[in-house]
Amino acid sequence: MADISSSGSGSSSSLVPPSDDRGYLLTEQVNSASEQLDQLSTDALVELFIEEDLRPQQAVFGARRALSDAVDAIAERLQANGRLFYLGAGTSGRLGVLDAAECPPTFCSPPELVQGILAGGAPALLRSSEGLEDLESAAVADLQDRGFCSDDCLVGIAAGGTTPYVRGGLSYAKNLGALSIAMACVPSEQAPLPCAIDIRLLTGPELLTGSTRLKAGTATKMALNILSTGVMVRL
């Protein structure tokens, strides 16, 4: 519901690690195509963004088997009176909330059937809330507040695959016996996540280094469209 509470195809861009400690992650690498982004003409900048935005579709296609497995597994749970939860922080969490909010008007589904949980709650939907994603225990508390149980499904969304809030939620779901699905935009060997189904959308480095609201966000929205629509047409 809209109410919010507290393996794929890679990029061919050359990778240059930035200086921070997350530089090993694919999403945090420097995209050589944008090293002089501020010096491009407007036409060249627009063309570069359009060219780079072809990569999300390639990434989603590369993850098609995991997406198919997730659709079937979620549909089976929902047919047995389970629910679907999206959980994330920042852009990843907002995209989950968006997809959940659009299910009732699109599919006439009850608002409790698909729910989005964003680290930091409603304020984080409108304003970045750094630090709120760093507590694994916060995810557990948010899931417990929704009555999350072993019949349910959790899709933990984290572009870089390292968000403690998402990791904590996935661990809780998996240990509870619920269906646990991870969605990230880095290879599993860079950031393994506890889950039964692992969806990796390898969009590569962003034109703005580390700004995963760009290609990673686009691929995530595409993947969530597939999950929710694929599931709903099977109910």
Residues covered by each model-derived region:
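A ubiquitous structural signal for well-ordered alpha-helices
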Residues: 45, 70-73, 142, 169
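Cofactor-/ligand-binding subdomain signature composed of acidic, glycine-rich
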Residues: 2-59
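Glycine-rich phosphate-binding loops that contact phosphosugars or nucleotide phosphates
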Residues: 85-235
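Short secondary-structure boundary/capping elements
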Residues: 37-41, 66, 131-138
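A short, well-structured juxtamembrane/interface segment
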Residues: 62-77
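Short, basic, glycine/proline-bearing loop/turn elements
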Residues: 52-62, 128, 153-156
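Residues at the C-terminal ends
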Residues: 79-80, 175
